[in-house]
């Protein structure tokens, strides 16, 4: 299969979403979502991730936290999974990039601005921290929120392009109803200002580079 035909879905968060995404994508990453402000039981988490790797192969952990220091704690552990951080809180956004996690997902989420600036973009580019552009929050938003989010995503994309930040476009689906195929995800990229080759690379080149870390 050629580079042009190969697509990767980097973030699906349920069994049913994974099974549907596998029909449309060549590789799919199963994401274990953790909402935490204290450290987990590490032995239990490692065992759960071991089982997920046996079942799904490629696995990520999505850390949702209000405690920036927890990001460094997770980064220091050898979890044998990609480490994503849910963006939104500016302190969390900054710490995710400083700690060199694999990806910061939707740094604008829940904000009245886009949660990302030239300083963070430059740091992300140097440290190889990808920005995840997620579709699912748009599906849950009202028309005003959707328009605002698209504007924020376009602003972040300008910085990602300028500073050569790794990135990917993903459904971030928590149910099968939120899964979308490569064509729809590419359309999202084009809608926020990507050229077609840039949107394609956000489903191919950049995801595959991240997967090489596993």
UniProtKB/Swiss-Prot annotation:
Its main location: cytoplasm. GO terms for biological process: tRNA 5'-leader removal. The keyword Hydrolase applies. GO terms for molecular function: ribonuclease P activity. Its EC number is 3.1.26.5. Transmembrane segments: none annotated. Pfam families: RNase_P_p30. It catalyses: Endonucleolytic cleavage of RNA, removing 5'-extranucleotides from tRNA precursor. Keywords: Cytoplasm, Endonuclease, Hydrolase, Nuclease, tRNA processing. Part of ribonuclease P, a protein complex that generates mature tRNA molecules by cleaving their 5'-ends. Consists of a catalytic RNA component and at least 4-5 protein subunits. Belongs to the eukaryotic/archaeal RNase P protein component 3 family. This is Ribonuclease P protein component 3. The lineage of its organism: Archaea, Methanobacteriati, Methanobacteriota, Thermococci, Thermococcales.
């Amino acid at each position: 299969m050629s580079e042009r035909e190969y697509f990767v879905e980097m973030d699906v968060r349920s069994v049913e979403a994974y099974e549907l995404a596998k029909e449309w994508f060549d590789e799919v990453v199963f994401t274990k979502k953790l909402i935490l402000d204290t450290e987990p039981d590490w032995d239990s988490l490692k065992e759960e991730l071991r089982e997920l790797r046996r079942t799904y192969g490629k696995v990520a952990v999505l850390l949702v936290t209000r405690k920036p220091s927890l990001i460094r704690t997770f980064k220091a552990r050898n979890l044998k999974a990609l480490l994503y951080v849910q963006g939104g809180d500016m302190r969390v956004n900054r710490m995710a990039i400083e700690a060199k996690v694999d990806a910061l997902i939707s740094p604008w989420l829940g904000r009245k601005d886009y949660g990302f600036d030239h300083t963070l973009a430059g740091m992300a580019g140097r440290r190889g921290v990808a920005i995840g552009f997620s579709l699912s929050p748009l599906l849950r938003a009202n028309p005003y929120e959707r328009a605002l989010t698209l504007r924020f995503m376009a602003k972040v994309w300008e910085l990602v392009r300028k500073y050569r930040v790794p990135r990917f476009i993903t459904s971030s689906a928590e149910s099968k109803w939120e899964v979308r195929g490569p064509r729809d995800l590419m359309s999202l990229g084009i809608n926020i200002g990507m050229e077609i080759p840039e949107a394609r690379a956000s489903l191919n080149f950049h995801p595959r580079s991240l997967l090489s870390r596993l």
